């Protein structure tokens, strides 16, 4: 079974903030495949189902971003899911808005949610889908920016971006990380795969 975990913060005030892109991608997958992500388990909302013939658990940790590992580690242990079948989806301020980068391993690169996950699992060999949120202009406070509502000017692109990310996650489960990286890693919207 795959555990597809979107990182974010619980609460309506954060629902459409850049920091909740991981939740939005999980919601999109849930909608596409008829999976209800409503069951509480290990400090997360989860839903079990199938994507392209693969058993999956969709999860949205409810611990707040910086404690995400506190939810995912017990969830994985309880359901005996291999770490190689964990995919973590989250926002990345180091990447421009609309960019997507799948990585099979690596550091948290300053992302506190991913840092928590790595600390709890004691390994950085965790597949992750990083979703670029940098607006392309200087920002005063990264912490304020990631928690503020997504700008109206970006809302039109948000639907496409979330759909693109959901397709990337789906491809990881169906075809593996390497193929997904080749197909989906991109610097910004509009670039073809060869340029990304």
From Swiss-Prot:
SUPFAM superfamilies xrefs: Peptidyl-tRNA hydrolase-like
Main location: cytoplasm
Active site: 19
One function term, GO molecular function aspect: peptidyl-tRNA hydrolase activity
Enzyme class: hydrolase
The organism's place on the tree of life at top rank: Bacteria
EC number per UniProt: 3.1.1.29
Cellular localization per UniProt: Cytoplasm
Gene3D superfamilies: Peptidyl-tRNA hydrolase (3.40.50.1470)
GO-annotated cellular components: cytoplasm
Site location (Discriminates between blocked and unblocked aminoacyl-tRNA): 9
UniProt keyword annotation of Protein biosynthesis present: no
Positions with a binding annotation for tRNA: 14, 64, 66, 112
Keywords: Cytoplasm, Hydrolase, RNA-binding, tRNA-binding
Subunit structure: Monomer.
Family in the record: Belongs to the PTH family.
Protein name: Peptidyl-tRNA hydrolase
Lineage: Bacteria, Pseudomonadati, Acidobacteriota, Terriglobia, Bryobacterales
Gene that this sequence comes from: pth
């Amino acid at each position: 079974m795959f555990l597809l975990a979107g990182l974010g913060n619980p609460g309506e005030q954060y629902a459409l903030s850049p920091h909740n892109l991981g939740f939005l991608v999980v919601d999109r997958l849930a909608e596409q495949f008829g999976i209800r992500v409503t069951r509480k388990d290990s400090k997360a909302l989860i839903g079990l189902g199938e994507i392209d013939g693969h058993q999956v658990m969709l999860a949205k940790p409810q611990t707040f971003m910086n404690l995400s590992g506190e939810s995912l580690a017990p969830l994985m242990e309880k359901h005996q899911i291999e770490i190689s079948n964990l995919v973590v989806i989250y926002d990345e301020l180091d990447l421009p808005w609309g960019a997507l980068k799948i990585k099979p391993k690596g550091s948290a690169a300053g992302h506190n949610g991913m840092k928590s996950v790595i600390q709890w699992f004691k390994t950085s060999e965790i597949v992750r889908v990083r979703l670029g949120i940098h607006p392309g202009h200087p920002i005063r406070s990264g912490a304020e920016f990631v928690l503020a509502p997504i700008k109206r000017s970006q809302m039109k692109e948000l639907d496409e971006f979330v759909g693109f990310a959901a397709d990337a996650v789906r491809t990881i489960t169906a075809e593996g990380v390497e193929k997904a990286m080749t197909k989906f890693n991109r610097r910004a919207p509009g670039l073809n795969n060869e340029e990304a």
